[in-house]
């Protein structure tokens, strides 16, 4: 169990980023206008934006003043939100992913191909990332307030964290120090005393649902959860959590304990 948690924490995605045709220097080769980067599944796209912009700076024809402001990523012409973990977005958007028995075939190892875009007008649904890490940090804190409220019935625990504890919590994500992360997380809730679980379900049409999952029913299965939110488990071909196809018979309580993301939520992607 602990080994699986460690693998989830260190899980990565291979990503190819190509500069959008709208902002690339004319006649730039594909090799020059693209870069490859390994992104952590349990991290935010915004973490990687400055690195990508700097790597591709020589091929960008438009002037810019910030590595964050007016930048965004697109996938197949659609804006990709930065406020969800990278792995969740990849599992949701990757159309080439196929399952073969209990294992994924080689298509799961293909690059996630993103476009780097810039402009004053953001695509619909894209939250402007203006203040860089500080904005991501504030958003992440807000997510934990929501998660704590669901888990404990109030956000008191996250609000009452000492400044050193909160800073250590944040830095543990950036430095990938799982032991520090778990040490602070343990102060925010206890699985044995939780009231409900913070769960988000992405549907095949890209809608995100946030059902109420009371822990009074510790035998609640994925299938029962889907049925409760009018997503017939019979019509769902697969349920993906942290890149892993899970059984609809799996226990939600146990899945949360293993697979909850850095923002306190368990994400289920249905297809």
Curated annotation (Swiss-Prot):
Regions crossing the membrane: none
A single GO molecular function term of this UniProt record: Atg8-family ligase activity
Topology within the bilayer: Peripheral membrane protein
A Pfam short name: ATG5_UblB
Keyword presence, Oxidoreductase: no
InterPro entries found in the cross-reference section: Atg5, ATG5_HBR, Atg5_HR, ATG5_UblA, Atg5_UblA_dom_sf, ATG5_UblB
Disruption phenotype: Impairs the formation of preautophagosomal structures.
Biological processes per GO annotation: autophagy of mitochondrion; cellular response to nitrogen starvation; piecemeal microautophagy of the nucleus; protein transport
Cellular localisation: Preautophagosomal structure membrane
GO cellular component: Atg12-Atg5-Atg16 complex; autophagosome; mitochondria-associated endoplasmic reticulum membrane contact site; phagophore; phagophore assembly site membrane
Effect of residue 145 to A: Impairs the formation of the ATG12-ATG5 conjugate
Record key words, sorted: Autophagy, Isopeptide bond, Membrane, Protein transport, Transport, Ubl conjugation
Post-translational modification comment from the UniProt entry: Conjugated to ATG12; which is essential for autophagy. Conjugation with ATG12 involves ATG7 as an E1-like activating enzyme and ATG10 as an E2-like conjugating enzyme.
Functional summary from the UniProt entry: Involved in cytoplasm to vacuole transport (Cvt) and autophagic vesicle formation. Autophagy is essential for maintenance of amino acid levels and protein synthesis under nitrogen starvation. Required for selective autophagic degradation of the nucleus (nucleophagy). Also required for mitophagy, which eliminates defective or superfluous mitochondria in order to fulfill cellular energy requirements and prevent excess ROS production.
PANTHER family xrefs: AUTOPHAGY PROTEIN 5
Protein's name in the database: Autophagy-related protein 5
Organism from which the protein derives: Kluyveromyces marxianus (strain DMKU3-1042 / BCC 29191 / NBRC 104275)
Phylogenetic lineage: Eukaryota, Fungi, Dikarya, Ascomycota, Saccharomycotina
């Amino acid at each position: 169990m602990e080994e699986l948690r460690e693998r989830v924490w260190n899980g990565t995605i291979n990503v190819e980023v190509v500069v959008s045709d709208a902002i690339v220097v004319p006649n730039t080769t594909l090799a020059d206008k693209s870069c490859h980067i390994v992104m952590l599944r349990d991290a935010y796209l915004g973490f990687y934006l400055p690195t990508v912009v700097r790597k591709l700076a020589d091929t960008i024809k438009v002037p810019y003043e910030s590595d964050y402001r007016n930048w965004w990523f697109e996938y197949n012409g659609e804006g990709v939100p930065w406020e969800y973990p990278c792995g969740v977005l990849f599992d949701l958007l990757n159309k080439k992913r196929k399952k073969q028995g209990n294992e994924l075939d080689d298509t799961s190892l293909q690059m996630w191909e993103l476009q780097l875009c810039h402009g004053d007008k953001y695509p619909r649904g894209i939250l402007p990332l203006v203040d860089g890490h500080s904005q991501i940090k504030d958003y992440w804190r807000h997510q934990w307030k929501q998660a704590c409220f669901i888990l404990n019935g109030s956000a008191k625990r996250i609000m009452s964290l000492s400044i050193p504890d909160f800073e250590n919590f944040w830095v543990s994500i950036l430095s990938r120090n799982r032991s520090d992360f778990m040490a602070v997380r343990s102060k925010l809730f206890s699985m044995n005393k939780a009231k409900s679980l913070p769960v988000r379900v992405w549907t095949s049409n890209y809608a995100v649902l946030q059902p109420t999952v009371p822990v009074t029913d510790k035998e609640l299965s994925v299938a029962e959860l889907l049925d409760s939110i009018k997503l017939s488990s019979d019509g769902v071909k697969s349920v993906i959590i942290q890149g892993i196809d899970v059984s609809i018979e799996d226990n939600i309580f146990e899945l949360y304990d293993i697979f909850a993301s850095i923002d306190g939520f368990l994400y289920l992607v249905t297809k």
